[in-house]
């Protein structure tokens, strides 16, 4: 089994999703199937077929999340130190052209969320940053062209772990 690098927070979110799927979504769909089945003839029962399709989707998602959890390799970012960019680092950059500042945290593919400033370790920006240090200038090659950044800072901080979902 190929190991999937992940932060502690990413693993917590996956476990929370699995708990929600098993304890909320699965029982809810079982109830919907039972109610639809009570309406009679299953061959022409659109509610029943829709509920069974939804159940299949939920069971598939449960299997997928269980696989991700089983193959997770949790990287403790607090064990890193120094100014070299590695998985889990929070990196502040300055756009060499515009002077704009941006901060990214390098995470596993399953955790990436640009809106939260989390970029995949396999993204063009992360690939350009890995192994570099504070003060280095990096050129990021992406489908949109080349962009130059200067690494302002590299930090290794534990992200705030998510709380249990509602």
Curated annotation (Swiss-Prot):
Top-level taxon of origin: Bacteria
Keyword annotations of the record: DNA-binding, Transcription, Transcription regulation
Molecular function terms, GO-annotated: DNA binding; RNA polymerase binding
Transcription keyword on record: yes
Pfam families with a match to the protein in the record: GreA_GreB (PF01272), GreA_GreB_N (PF03449)
A biological process term (GO) from this entry: regulation of DNA-templated transcription elongation
Family affiliation: Belongs to the GreA/GreB family.
Job description of the protein: Necessary for efficient RNA polymerase transcription elongation past template-encoded arresting sites. The arresting sites in DNA have the property of trapping a certain fraction of elongating RNA polymerases that pass through, resulting in locked ternary complexes. Cleavage of the nascent transcript by cleavage factors such as GreA or GreB allows the resumption of elongation from the new 3'terminus. GreA releases sequences of 2 to 3 nucleotides.
PANTHER family recorded: TRANSCRIPTION ELONGATION FACTOR GREA (PTHR30437:SF4)
Protein name from the UniProt record: Transcription elongation factor GreA
Organism of this sequence: Anaeromyxobacter sp. (strain K)
């Amino acid at each position: 089994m190929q190991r999937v690098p992940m932060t502690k927070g990413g693993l917590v979110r996956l476990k929370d999703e699995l708990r929600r799927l098993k304890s909320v979504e699965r029982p809810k769909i079982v109830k919907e199937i039972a109610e639809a089945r009570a309406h009679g003839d299953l061959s022409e029962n659109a509610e029943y077929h829709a509920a069974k399709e939804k159940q299949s989707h939920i069971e598939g998602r449960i299997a997928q999340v269980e696989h991700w959890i089983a193959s997770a390799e949790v990287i403790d970012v607090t064990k890193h130190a120094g100014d070299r960019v590695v998985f889990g680092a929070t990196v502040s950059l300055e756009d060499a052209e515009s002077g704009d500042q941006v901060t990214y945290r390098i995470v596993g593919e399953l955790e990436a969320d640009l809106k939260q400033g989390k970029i995949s370790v396999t993204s063009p920006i992360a690939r350009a940053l890995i192994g570099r240090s504070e003060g280095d200038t990096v050129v990021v090659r992406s489908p949109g062209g080349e962009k130059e950044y200067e690494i302002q800072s590299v930090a290794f901080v534990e992200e705030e772990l998510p709380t249990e979902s509602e």
